[in-house]
Amino acid sequence: MSIALLGLDNSAVSTNLDDADYLERELDLLWKEQDSAGKKIFLTRVNQRLPELEYLFRDAASPLDLHWTLLAAISYQESHWNPQAISKTGVRGLMMLTQTTAKEVGITKRTDPKQSVVGGSIYLQKLINNLPESVPRQDRLWMAIAAYNLGFSYLTEARQITKKMNKDPENWDDVREILLFLTKNSTDHLMKVRIKEAVNYVQKVQLYYQTLSVIKRDKEI
């Protein structure tokens, strides 16, 4: 059985599920360039926190064109699956929604786990839908996730600049390249930090999503 994962490099993913060491080997490959402490914390929270929340991600993803492990990955990046999480800027809850976003998606209590996950999933789907249908599905997904962190207007501006620089505004890798280029040429320190955070945000979500996909598929086999 193949373990092809949406939009990610699967060259290192084994198809030999009879190998007893398969899961450990795949996780080692996925995290080989990552902080080992971060891996340990993530896997610990997969065991300790995710079981109580998994049904929320599954339920929220079900009516949408999303997979529950993707919502779970975004939530981990946002809050480490802590329903009471709050940032210095005032965003809070499992999906770290702003007050404005919460109102937009009909959420009244951001620290309520179910409301937060439902609200975050609706908001993500809106971001996906706001991108042109001509953008390939995988690229729309990564761009929407970048916009979840950075803001849709900044993503739109980055795509416009990508086109002006003769790159493909419908390809996430090209847009990401331009975002990083902008950080080298901007005098706005705060914006440089935000852009770098957004690019790193997508990379982390991809890592957590791929890790969860490997773990959960292994358990379902």
Pin down the residues of each PLM region.
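Substrate-binding/active-site groove segments that recognize
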Residues: Q84-T108, Q115-K126, F181, V205
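Short, functionally critical alpha-helical segments immediately adjacent to catalytic or ligand/cofactor-binding
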Residues: R58, D65-N82, V117-S121, A144-L150, ...
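N-terminal export signals and maturation junctions of secreted/periplasmic proteins
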Residues: S2-R58, P83
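Catalytic and substrate-binding regions of cell-wall glycan-acting enzymes that process beta-1,4-linked
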Residues: D18, Y22-L30, A144-I215
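Extracytoplasmic
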Residues: E52, L66-L71, Y76, T89-R92, ...
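Second-shell loop/turn segments in exported
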Residues: K40-Q48, F57-S62, N82-A85, K103-P113, ...
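Secretory-pathway/luminal and periplasmic proteins that interact with or process carbohydrate-rich
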Residues: S79-K88, L127-N130, L150-M165
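Short, solvent-exposed mixed-charge patches
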Residues: E220-I221
